[in-house]
Amino acid sequence: MYLKIVLLKARALGALSRALGKGNGVMVAGRFILKFAPNAVEKLAANKRVVLISGTNGKSTTSKLIAEALRTKYSIAHNHTGANLFAGVAAALGANPDAEVAVLEVDELVLPWAIEKTKPELVVLLNLGRDQLDRLSEVRIVSNKWRSAISADTSKNLSVLASTDDPFVVYSAVRPAEPRPLLQRQR
């Protein structure tokens, strides 16, 4: 019951933000959810099939394609605005708490947290680029964090779809004890 009240207030806060011309309301709603229901992401993701998409480039396009394809059969929670940090994930899940599937674009640095909190069935890894080194530090560090998060998932339900064009992504995607097949683009 408490979570439902938090979600209603978050929606109202988002609507107020839009009405006042202070943005689209997604981030303020997500921050509100995380502040007043810190375990909301876990609770909202628990009854959903979750797909996470991450990489330096192509997250928004890929997540929109996946969401639209799945929308033909399922109700979808999706961060269609591109809000891919912690608050954006919370807001997307909170905006459609009864969705059957969550398709979530997540920032490269947020992916380990998102894997832990949402227990996804599928993680799509696109690429890791050096275009934001001021924020990402070093691509190898991000790749190691991805690999650790993927390896830490012991559910056996997690599948990883990874671009084999990027050696850092390949390294991230393969669990040391359990190599998985990867798809490679035909040339």
Model-flagged regions — what are they?
Residues 48, 125, 129-187:
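Acidic, Mg2+-coordinating active-site environments of NTP-dependent enzymes
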Residues 51-66:
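Glycine-rich phosphate-binding P-loop
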Residues 45-49, 73-74, 97-100, 119-122, ...:
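Short coil/turn connectors at secondary-structure junctions
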Residues 74-81:
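Conserved RecA-like helicase motor-core motifs
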Residues 90-127:
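Conserved nucleotide-sensing/catalytic segment adjacent to the nucleotide-binding pocket
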Residues 65-72, 121-131:
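Gly-rich Lys/Arg/Thr-decorated short loops/hinges at beta-loop-alpha junctions or inter-strand turns
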Residues 1-52, 68, 72, 84-92:
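Short, basic phosphate-binding NTP loop
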Residues 85-87, 110-112, 168:
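Short, well-ordered alpha-helical microsegments
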